[in-house]
């Protein structure tokens, strides 16, 4: 008999709208003794069936829903269908842009909560962030090996969010033979080196693909400051688009070494490129004090808020860094600024940048609103999937 999670009165509304999370404070009682990751049925207080998901006893999100179809069992065939659907949903994009690197599975937005899978050429990188995902690891690896027989499979489940599930970090080869690092992928006709072992996240920020191409429209014959550059790909696009000068700034010497490599693998000279291993916040203040200016500035900082308690501090951080960046822009210059925090609403982010402009005593115009690339879809019932917000602002 299925283990049953009964909700408190009135707490069924989000599931009836197909939001895939059940929080611990919504649960009335539990019929049975589920193990971590085990499949459970969720019912409303009056007993009517709502969904079927994975039990996570140590998390605030105690059930992540796999399916809202009562007839659908959670088994090997379920995961095979979900993986196939995810690939089909990306095939047009892959053909159109000639991609060899893309997000294959975007967790909740692809109906696979806690499961992220990125493809870099012939390497699949899995990030399993929930007890349910962890429980089905072997099945996922078997299916991926069948559906992508030429690919190695590597795990990068080494993020802090696993602690909230009571899970330890896990990394390593799951299937096949890993090629020598870095792997070279291609997007929009540009080659990019990716280290899936030592790189950020699963190795690279695939979600900024479209925004890199948009940024390239503003850089011809311009001076570009690329902040938090990681492996320098905004700068790489700028170099190919004819920027007069580029400064790539990051605290990581390893990331900057890969930025140099990216120029080389694309056959581009970096005579006009400066690689600066520095703290961006300190450097921007230094440049302001020195009176240094740029035509284009890219701000792509790491996440400032991991939870709601940190949001106010994040707002202050975003305002401060955008204010200083605007002070460094030449008249008519362009700022491309981003927030990758899912807790930051797009309208609030725009207000923060507008307030930063007031403090910087600069008049700005918002000329583009940016988001994540389309291989990072946003489920209609899962607004949390809309995490990357960006703005292009021209300053006068």
Curated annotation (Swiss-Prot):
One of its GO terms (molecular function) is RNA binding. Its EC number is 2.1.1.191. It is an enzyme of class 2 (transferase). InterPro entries: PUA, PUA-like_sf, PUA_sf, RLMI, RlmI-like_PUA, SAM-dep_methyl-trfase, SAM-dependent_MTases_sf. Its main location: cytoplasm. Keywords: Cytoplasm, Methyltransferase, RNA-binding, rRNA processing, S-adenosyl-L-methionine, Transferase. Residues 2-79 form the PUA domain. GO terms for cellular component: cytoplasm. It comes from the Bacteria. It catalyses: cytidine(1962) in 23S rRNA + S-adenosyl-L-methionine = 5-methylcytidine(1962) in 23S rRNA + S-adenosyl-L-homocysteine + H(+). It holds the Pfam family Methyltrans_SAM. The keyword Lipoprotein does not apply. It is found in: Cytoplasm. PANTHER family: RIBOSOMAL RNA LARGE SUBUNIT METHYLTRANSFERASE, S-ADENOSYLMETHIONINE-DEPENDENT METHYLTRANSFERASE DOMAIN-CONTAINING PROTEIN. Belongs to the methyltransferase superfamily. RlmI family. Specifically methylates the cytosine at position 1962 (m5C1962) of 23S rRNA. This is Ribosomal RNA large subunit methyltransferase I. It comes from Shewanella baltica (strain OS185).
């Amino acid at each position: 008999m299925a283990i049953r999670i009964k909700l408190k009165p009135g707490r069924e509304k989000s599931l009836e709208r197909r939001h895939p999370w059940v929080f611990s404070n919504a649960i009335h009682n539990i019929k049975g003794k589920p193990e971590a990751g085990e499949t459970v049925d969720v019912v409303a207080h009056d007993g009517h069936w709502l969904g079927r998901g994975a039990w996570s006893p140590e998390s605030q999100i105690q059930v992540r829903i796999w399916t809202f179809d009562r007839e659908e069992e959670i088994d090997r065939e379920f995961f095979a269908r979900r993986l196939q659907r995810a690939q089909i949903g990306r095939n047009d994009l892959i053909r159109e842009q000639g991609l060899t690197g893309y997000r294959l599975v975007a967790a909740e937005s692809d109906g696979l909560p806690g499961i992220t899978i990125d493809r870099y050429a012939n390497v699949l990188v899995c990030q399993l962030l929930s007890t349910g995902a962890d429980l089905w690891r072997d099945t996922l690896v078997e299916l991926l090996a069948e559906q992508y027989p030429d690919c190695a499979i590597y795990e990068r489940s080494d993020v802090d969010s696993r602690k909230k599930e009571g899970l330890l970090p896990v990394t390593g080869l799951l299937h096949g033979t890993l090629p020598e690092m870095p792997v070279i992928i291609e997007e929009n006709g540009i080659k990019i080196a990716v280290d899936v072992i030592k790189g950020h996240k699963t190795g690279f920020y695939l979600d900024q693909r479209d925004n890199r191409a948009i940024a390239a429209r503003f850089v011809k014959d311009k001076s570009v400051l690329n902040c938090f550059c990681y492996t320098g790909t905004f700068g790489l696009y700028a170099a190919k688009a004819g920027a007069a000068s580029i400064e790539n700034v990051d605290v990581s010497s390893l990331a900057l070494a890969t930025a140099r490599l990216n120029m080389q693998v694309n056959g581009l000279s970096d005579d006009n490129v400066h690689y600066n291993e520095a703290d961006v916040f300190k450097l921007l203040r230094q440049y302001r004090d020195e009176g240094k200016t740029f035509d284009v500035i890219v701000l792509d900082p790491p996440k400032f808020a991991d939870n709601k308690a940190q949001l106010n501090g994040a707002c202050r951080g975003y305002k401060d860094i955008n204010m200083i960046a605007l002070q460094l822009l030449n008249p008519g210059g362009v700022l491309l600024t981003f927030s990758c925090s899912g807790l930051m609403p797009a309208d609030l982010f725009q207000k923060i940048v507008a307030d930063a402009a007031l403090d910087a005593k600069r008049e700005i115009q918002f000329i583009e609103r940016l988001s994540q690339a389309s291989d990072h879809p946003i489920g209609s019932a899962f607004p949390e999937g809309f995490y990357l917000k960006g703005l292009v602002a021209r300053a006068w």
